[in-house]
A protein has these predicted regions:
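Extended ligand-binding clefts on enzyme/binding-domain cores
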Residues: 1, 143-155, 161-168, 187, ...
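Acidic/polar, glycine-enriched structural segments that form the non-catalytic walls/loops
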Residues: 1-151
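Generic recognition of stable, solvent-exposed alpha-helical segments in well-folded globular domains
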Residues: 23-25, 29, 41, 45, ...
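Well-ordered alpha-helical scaffold segments within catalytic/enzyme domains
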Residues: 49-51, 98-107, 157-169, 218-234, ...
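Aromatic-rich carbohydrate-recognition surfaces in CAZymes
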Residues: 67-90, 148-257, 273-291
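Extended, well-ordered alpha-helical scaffold segments
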Residues: 78, 115, 169-181, 219, ...
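Aromatic-lined, polymer-binding surfaces characteristic
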Residues: 113-132, 151, 184-193, 210-217, ...
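Terminal, non-catalytic domain-edge segments
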Residues: 405, 420-453
Length: 453
């Protein structure tokens, strides 16, 4: 370091490093002489890459990273192409940066844009991109800082808004492994698996607890969202049989879920979950919506009617004065009903708009300095779900009321880690989780603007 500071040259040897330290602490140093510094801008760049040889084991088949094109491209080809196309790529990056900041600011204000910018890279980088033998895209998430599950459905679900906005093919890549797992007969339960393994081995579910209503609702809702974004239900048509199985499961078991896990599994099992029930109703309605898009009118009418019947029962079972309960059997409780956001965004229109308005008004009485708690049981929250709850009514003032404390948390938290989605609302400190893809859910407001323009 001292030599470099004096003459700008690297000696090739690190200062005061013992042989043992050298084994443990590999150091790479690089210098580039940019000439005399004056008023004119001078820049340089360095290409750094990593070849993991095989990225993912997918049902006992080792798959290379997508960029390698089944071995037709190696790391040296990638470096050469990167160098050749450097200027153009940097311009594309800068152009997209501007686009993202402009359209998210237009959707929700400058502070919302800053939250989205903070989330963008993290939401993508928590995945590996590969293809299966047939060339189907697989965009496999890792559950960072929880249990390391790969391809978790209830990680895909909260992250989806960003990918629906910018690249629905990547969302399909998250869903493809779950469809394959069921359609291949490897998973034979009447609801989707929770995951397809433990990173980096996607050989089948390893998580100890199923989430039957949770994952069925997630897959049906996301398939519906893709259909609306693309203007057709072709993707759903490819998987219609298994989607039908899941929709029928929700018709039977979804209105008043038994003692099972949902995506907020850190809070433990509990029965009669009203927000989970909404997810089931949205899943049934979504199936009906897709059936209509596929010309299956009788099926569409039947499932949409069932969803409305379920919603009517939900209202009478969940009502608790000026709000709606956490669980059907416990008065004096409350929770964020973030799953309700899809009713308006996907034009399902199953619930009266008064439900969202009533809940939103009540949430304002429960908000803390750094956000709205997840429910009445704890002070902590999930910031991705807050950004969904903020979109329940479509009202700009309501959105800002709930979004701004999340920005304040991200800006002021003393937990200086890759953005945590699970924090305490009273003091803004991390409760757990970090560097996870679920922050793609921050893009719900942008998705709303795109769907409702």
């Amino acid at each position: 370091k001292k030599a470099f500071m004096s003459d700008g040259r690297l000696s090739g040897k690190a200062d005061n490093v013992s042989p043992d330290m050298e084994k443990q602490m590999t150091v790479l140093a690089y210098s580039d002489n940019l000439g005399k510094v004056n008023g004119k801008t001078v820049s340089g760049h360095l290409l750094i890459g990593y070849d993991d040889l095989y990225a993912i084991q997918y049902f006992n088949d080792n798959r290379m990273a997508y960029w390698k094109h089944d071995g037709q491209t190696d790391i040296f080809d990638a470096f050469a192409k990167g160098q050749k196309e450097y200027a153009g790529m940097m311009k594309r990056c800068a152009d997209f940066d501007r686009q993202l900041m402009q359209e998210t600011a237009a959707a929700g204000g400058q502070k919302y844009a800053e939250l989205c910018a903070l989330a963008y890279r993290q939401a993508i980088s928590a995945h590996k991109l590969v293809a299966d033998k047939e060339g189907n895209l697989l965009f496999l998430s890792k559950e960072n800082f929880s249990n390391g599950s790969i391809g978790t459905v209830d990680i895909t679900y909260p992250s989806a808004p960003m990918f629906l906005c910018y690249n629905p093919e990547l969302l399909k890549g998250m869903m493809n492994p779950i469809f394959y797992y069921s359609e291949s007969g490897r998973w034979n339960k009447p609801f989707p698996s929770h995951d397809v393994g433990t990173y980096p081995q996607a050989n089948g579910q390893t998580y100890g607890g199923d989430m039957p209503v949770e994952e069925s609702g997630n897959m049906l809702i996301l398939a519906t969202a893709i259909a609306i974004i693309e203007g057709n239900a072709d993707y759903a048509a490819k998987h219609w049989d298994v989607l039908t199985t899941w929709a029928d499961y929700l018709k039977k078991e979804g209105l008043d879920p038994d003692n099972q896990l949902c995506t907020d599994d850190f809070a433990g099992h509990f029965a009669h979950n009203t927000n989970l029930s909404i997810k089931a109703i949205m899943g049934v309605a979504g199936y009906g919506k897709m059936a209509g898009m596929l010309g299956k009118k009788e099926i569409a009418d039947s499932y949409l009617a069932t969803a409305r019947e379920m919603a009517g029962k939900w209202i009478s079972m969940a009502k608790d004065g000026d709000h709606y309960k956490l669980t059907f059997d416990k008065s004096g409780t409350w929770s964020q009903k973030y799953n309700l956001v899809w009713d308006r965004l996907l034009d399902l229109n199953i619930f009266p708009s008064e439900i969202a308005e009533t809940e939103t008004a009540y949430y304002k009485t429960r908000q803390n300095k750094y956000g709205l708690p997840l429910d009445n049981r704890e002070d902590y929250t999930k910031s991705d779900w807050i950004l969904w709850s903020a979109c329940l009514t479509g009202n700009t003032a309501d959105f800002e009321t709930f979004m701004l404390p999340v920005w304040k948390y991200a800006n002021e938290t003393t937990s200086r880690v890759p953005l945590s989605d699970w924090h305490y609302t009273s003091d803004g400190t991390q409760r757990g989780f970090q560097a996870r893809s679920v922050v793609g859910g921050y893009y719900m407001r942008l998705l709303e603007k795109r769907l409702k323009k």
